[in-house]
Amino acid sequence: MVARNDSAMEITDEEFDETINNSHKLVVVDFFAEWCLDPKTELIFNPEIKNINKVEKGSRVLSFDNNFNESYANVKSTHKIVSNKRIKILTRRGREIACTPEHLLLTENGFIKADKLSTDNSIAAYLFSTYPKIKENSKLFLTRDLIVKTAMKLNLDKERYIEELEQRGLLKLRYDNEKAHVLASLLGLLLTDGSLSMQKNNLRSVEFFVNEKDVDEVIKDLKFIGYEAGVRKQEIVGKINNREFSQKITRVRVSKTSLFILFASLGGIIGKKFIRGLKIPEWILKGPAEIQKSFLQGFLGGDGTKLEIKTIKDKQGNTYNKSFINPIEFHFYSEAENSPDNFLKEFSYLLENSGVKIRKATIEKEERYKRKDKKESILIKIPIHTNFKSAYSYTSIGFKYALNKKLPSLLAREYLKERIELLEEMKKKREQAVLMKDKFDIKKISDTLNVPISTIYNWFTGKEARNPRGFIEYNDWIKKYVKGKIAYDKIKKIVVEEGKQYPFISVSLDNETKMFVANELIHHNCMPCLMMNPVIEELANKMKEVKFVKINSDENQNLSSRYRVSTIPCLIIFKDGKEVDRIIGGQTGDVIEEKLRGYLE
């Protein structure tokens, strides 16, 4: 028997029937759920970013272990939530989240409820968000006919190879298929740090050469398309201009002819890439921007250069932070089958389509060193503009399979994002100042906009808006805002909205840590969403003739399913063991009391 008292008690599935059948009172059951976010919130699924309203039971979403290493959690349950209160949080770097008051976000002081946060707090942002946002695009880029044609050309037209691809769902793909993005990234890596080659017994293999710490990411993507890989460590000894060097690499190999045929069909280069020359595949060039980005992530992970920010002094002794990106370089055989001029145009197109500005690129004879085989080498050198927006766009592409490039570039991206947001804020203030010029004096404008008088004078003489003062050296900025794989983003503004019925989505995860990433911020789903709790407790103390109990929908899923509870909060009213009514969504105590008294008469 469940104990009686004046507060609303939480009960379980096992206690439910006894509670509603053996009570001589009217029974009100409050079904509640865990964390709640706006339906437009973006979650990281495997392997893409989608709105939370796409989540369903069994979905896999990005989570972490206790050391903040990536892992995936399964969704145990999901519910629609209606609340009469919504909290919007905006950060200094332009991130935004809308949630219920009790929702937990990770801050520099641990997990804190949304309604307890202030602009003194910073929220944890997860840096490694290189997952694609896939837009609807039903255009086919890979067909059975193309694969069969490639197999016949390679004298590999055996039915079992085609069947292997068919079993893995790789014979017919559209641009909006998740596998398309994984293949685009792997192909990018294959063209730079990989190979399609012949092995013993006439077996073909696909190999990727990466650092040891990048192996897991390659294997994860190969598994997603249905292939297991072998791993072998190797030390390469070389010599350039009488200077010997050694390099440790890890070979990730898939000895499956079907995968060899697949990548050959997609534009992979068989044999020595230096002799053949690089070429961007047509399906990438003609594909949507999201596919091009996925390709560049793998391609730049192989041959791209990382962006770094350094603190330097000018001739006047002024200190400032500057972005540095070494030119991206490629070597072509002077008699290569594929034209270096065409490759430069193709690659430049992909970069510029991603918002990256290129300085004047050059194609010239490589004079720095001679090849052992005496073949003449052509050097393509592509310098990248390092202004705020171009540098930010470059780092926003992301590097897959290259942690040594990915981490410094993503840290730089956070810094650039902050400076860009501050610059945009100053531009808006400049526009406001110009509009106020004829109505107020300069001091009033300065005080209203919180901008120095000298800056207002400069704006009125035609000067453009610049980043505000308050310079901090980049290394000090890193120490202030970055901890391991997490960058803390300071809260800029908190908006509390009330008086309407706001929709939310509740999701419960099955792993230990319960952490996840939404809108690039780190959240926790352990705190129950008890939005009706104060109202229910007040009514329980006031209406002694009614018994109030609470059910956690996620922990008692059979009961939620039995009563078809899909929207939270949901109050179900029982009389003599039978449901007589239900109240959906957040309601005031007066509304609920009036309805309950109707069943007491």
Which residues does each PLM region occupy?
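A short, hydrophobic beta-strand/beta-hairpin element that forms part of a small beta-sheet core
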Residues: V27-F31, I536, P569-R582
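Intein-associated homing endonuclease modules of the LAGLIDADG/DOD-type, together
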Residues: S63, T78-K370, A487-N525
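Short, amphipathic alpha-helical "recognition" segments used to contact nucleic acids or chromatin
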Residues: I420-F440
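Thiol-based oxidoreductase modules, predominantly thioredoxin-like and allied folds used
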Residues: E10-T12, F31-E34, N533-N558
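Short alpha-helical "recognition helix" segments of helix-turn-helix
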Residues: D441-L449
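A short beta-strand-turn-helix
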Residues: M9-V27, Q557
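Short active-site neighborhood of thiol/selenol oxidoreductases, capturing the structured segment around
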Residues: S23-E34, C526
